[in-house]
Regions:
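A short His-aromatic
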Residues: 116-120
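Conserved N-terminal segment of class I S-adenosyl-L-methionine
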Residues: 1-105, 111-115, 125-128, 162-165
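A SAM-dependent methyltransferase catalytic signature shared across enzymes that methylate proteins
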Residues: 169
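Hydrophobic residues within beta-strands of alpha/beta enzymes
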Residues: 70, 141-143
Length: 169
């Protein structure tokens, strides 16, 4: 884990949609995202991994440094095209797809990684059912979501793209 990872900055920046890390998100957000992928990379070493809502692809590429294989899935076609063109590795591919209807067969991955995704979905049950469907028995689910009480202490969502924020309770 001694190697340094540098996120590739696209020549033409992806537009801020509230649903992926871009250059306009700020350094604190980038540090938090990279930290999550550092943890996931340790947990996913040598495994077949699905990165749901992979965004511009930097995290999937980072996971691919130690995973057997990585599939990054994102709902936005332009983002998938960017990821495919920017992060080309033999054990890494990107697909367009929805977190509630993952375009992969049953039981095809050892680990599912999904960071800052569930709060963008109304259908949490459908998302979690899809994670279960694509995981092999005994698989790992590495997930994070901003805690509403920390990121939105007034109770109102601080990000208009968060449709169902979570709390500890």
């Amino acid at each position: 884990m001694g190697e340094i990872f540098k996120r590739t900055v696209p020549d033409v920046p992806l537009a801020w949609t509230g649903e992926r890390l871009t250059n306009s998100a700020g350094p604190q957000v980038e540090i938090e995202h990279l930290h999550r992928y550092f943890v996931a990379r340790t947990l996913c070493r040598g495994l077949d991994v699905l990165d749901i809502a992979c965004g511009e692809g930097y995290g999937s590429a980072f996971l691919a440094q130690t995973a057997r294989s990585v599939v990054g899935v994102d709902v936005d076609q332009a983002t998938v095209a960017h990821a495919s063109a920017t992060y080309a590795e033999p054990n890494l591919r990107f697909l367009e797809g929805d977190a509630r209807r993952i375009p992969l067969p049953d039981g095809c991955v050892d680990a599912v990684v999904s960071f800052e995704t569930i709060e963008h979905l109304y259908e949490h049950d459908a998302f979690l059912a899809e994670v279960r469907r694509v995981l092999r028995p005994g698989g790992r689910f590495v997930v994070s979501s901003p805690e509403r009480d920390v990121y939105s202490p007034t109770g109102a969502a601080s990000n208009p793209y968060h449709v169902r924020e979570l709390t500890r309770a």
